[in-house]
Amino acid sequence: MKKPIHKVLYVQVIVAIIIGIGLGHFYPDLAVDMKPLGDGFIKLIKMVIGPIIFCTVVTGIAGMEDMKKVGRVGGKALLYFEIVSTFALVLGLIATHVLKPGVGFNIDPATLDGKAVASYAAKAHGQTTVDFLMHIIPDTLVSAFAQGEILQILLIALLFGAVLATAGEKGKVVTGFIDGLSHVLFGIVRIITKLAPIGAFGAMAFTIGKYGIGSLLPMLKLIGTFYLTSVVFVVVVLGIIARAVGFNILRFVAYIKEEMLIVLGTSSSEAALPQLMLKLERLGCSRSVVGLVVPTGYSFNLDGTNIYMTMAVLFIAQATNTDLTWTQQLTLLAVTMLTSKGASGVTGAGFITLAATLAVVPTIPLSGMVLILGIDRFMSECRALTNIVGNGVATVVVSAWEKELDRSKLNAALRGDVAIKEPAGV
């Protein structure tokens, strides 16, 4: 028996987003005060992300008979991430050259006030590649969870799971406890997810109330170019990959529509991480692959952020009439491939990563970031949506590559004609 339409989550989220836009447009002062609703929802989700990743990865690895499989799955995932990320970067480069969203602005960099982006630049300068790698190692076991550092938690879970896999019967007792804990955590997620419409309303009302729909008008060409390129990437690039694996990308997008609407409302792909992991297990992906690929992808497979990075940098170059040679543009791609690894699923992280890229490519004025500061919040939604679809597809691909994809579940779930039971441990 189907739920009444007013009780369906994605319908509630859509209505909440529309109401949020209306409140932000007509009552901006009141709408800005709704910010705690969005922030509170994201904090509730982030509260359980670390423990869920830990439990999922530990039980997945502990259940693997061959520990070489962990390295194999991780290696395949990273290879896939780098290949697809390169496609995203190149597509952003090509689209900006073809559509030229920055041509005609003729802005003198000397007239730009860089104070507005000084804080982002400071954060960007504060971390090198070595710092990023060292940051993966937590100061203590507790600090990783306390600070919600996904990569640090993933490292702890990998070590924990590897030890449990070789600990015999004693290890099985601990694994059983952690598996039981995951039941509780996903139960908490189900409760929190019911609050998604409130969070989406608060975040959208704040965004429109603070920045206003009118702030979009001068930059509509850049926004349109970015959204169009992201759609092309999902439909064409990810569509071809999905077809090669044996599923339809549009049906996959429809399957995760609730998670995408949560992301749309909050502008944070992390807000839907627990639900995405649950949906992918229901889709037929093995729990061990989901546990390894999804958390890793949130730092290493940010397709939307990659498109945004090359497009934003070239837009600033076009707007300030800064000529770039092809060598400089190829260097830009290489630099972006590295700096984008530091972007997480948190709102605004992409802008900090952009500052890091411009800091390494001094030909383009860093003060040019001021041009897109006002609209970055509106582009954040598209970045997050593309990221979540990319990570979902990556998980299905790696599962199929490992021959751990249940095709019957996949086909039934995407058709929507069979009620899929929740996977074990959920």
From Swiss-Prot:
Tagged with keyword Calcium: no
UniProt-recorded name of the protein: C4-dicarboxylate transport protein
Principal subcellular localization: membrane
GO molecular function terms noted in the UniProt entry: fumarate transmembrane transporter activity; malate:proton symporter activity; succinate transmembrane transporter activity
Cellular component terms (Gene Ontology): plasma membrane
Membrane topology: Multi-pass membrane protein
Pfam families recorded: SDF (PF00375)
Gene Ontology biological process terms from the UniProt entry: L-aspartate transmembrane transport
InterPro entries, alphabetized: C4_dicarb_transport (IPR023954), Na-dicarboxylate_symporter (IPR001991), Na-dicarboxylate_symporter_CS (IPR018107), Na:dicarbo_symporter_sf (IPR036458)
Compartments (UniProt record): Cell inner membrane
PANTHER family, alphabetized: AEROBIC C4-DICARBOXYLATE TRANSPORT PROTEIN (PTHR42865:SF1), PROTON/GLUTAMATE-ASPARTATE SYMPORTER (PTHR42865)
PROSITE patterns named among the record's database cross-references: NA_DICARBOXYL_SYMP_1, NA_DICARBOXYL_SYMP_2
Family to which this protein belongs: Belongs to the dicarboxylate/amino acid:cation symporter (DAACS) (TC 2.A.23) family.
Alphabetic keyword roster: Cell inner membrane, Cell membrane, Membrane, Symport, Transmembrane, Transmembrane helix, Transport
Entry superkingdom: Bacteria
Keyword Cell membrane in annotation: yes
Organism (species): Paraburkholderia xenovorans (strain LB400)
Function: Responsible for the transport of dicarboxylates such as succinate, fumarate, and malate from the periplasm across the membrane.
Transmembrane segments: 8-28, 44-64, 78-98, 148-168, 173-193, 222-242, 297-317, 355-375
